[in-house]
Amino acid sequence: MEQGKKETPTVYLHDIKREYTQGETRLTILDSTKLALWAGQSVALVAPSGSGKSTLLHIAGLLESPDAGEVYIGGIATSGLSDVERTQIRRTDIGFVYQSHRLLPEFTALENVMLPQMIRGLKRAETVKRAQEILAYLGLEDRVTHRPAELSGGEQQRVAIARAVANAPRVLLADEPTGNLDPQTADHVFNALMQLVKATRVSMLIATHNMELADRMDRRVSLENGHVVELD
């Protein structure tokens, strides 16, 4: 863990170990894995399929618990927290973007972005204002009343990004967010993500196979034999 000595990483994975059982075989996916994410930094996680990219994202996002090690969010150790406390951290400090946008089809773009804030109990007027601002920032101000089926693939993914940052998280975790998009649309979605990193100083970790996009990020890391390796 480097960066500034006085700066606390938004997410720090310390000596993470995760194993799975396949038949009678015990597979080690992550082994004493360490990774720090810093405010305003974009990090590409590039590694072959089956290497543990999704597992690492799930653990960093408190969706899955490691067999050993500690996940720190904003300097707070999470292993001793209750399920309720972990859920609260996910809602306030972590945003998720997936390859499949998972928007609610019966909701408009605006309502989809409002939802995470409503779950937190924020007032409707406040959630409407913030959702409109984020959608406008991502160039979707004329799509707020459209439902997902009325939007293009790139527009749907930008709505998903807006939803992910609606609660102003510390960290944004994205699993192949441009994987289902054509190159031009993927570039637009990636640019939207990078704009948000610069504007909000959120930390962003993206698992991707797109090396062209990875090369445009602040850092590139890979997984080798369960360990995080920094790439040049």
Swiss-Prot record:
Entry protein name: Lipoprotein-releasing system ATP-binding protein LolD
Entry keyword Membrane: yes
EC numbers: 7.6.2.-
SUPFAM superfamilies documented for this protein: P-loop containing nucleoside triphosphate hydrolases
Organism: Nitrobacter winogradskyi (strain ATCC 25391 / DSM 10237 / CIP 104748 / NCIMB 11846 / Nb-255)
Highest taxon listed in the record's lineage: Bacteria
Xref: InterPro entries: AAA+_ATPase (IPR003593), ABC_transporter-like_ATP-bd (IPR003439), ABC_transporter-like_CS (IPR017871), ABC_transpr_LolD-like (IPR015854), MacB-like_ATP-bd (IPR017911), P-loop_NTPase (IPR027417)
GO BP term, example: lipoprotein localization to outer membrane
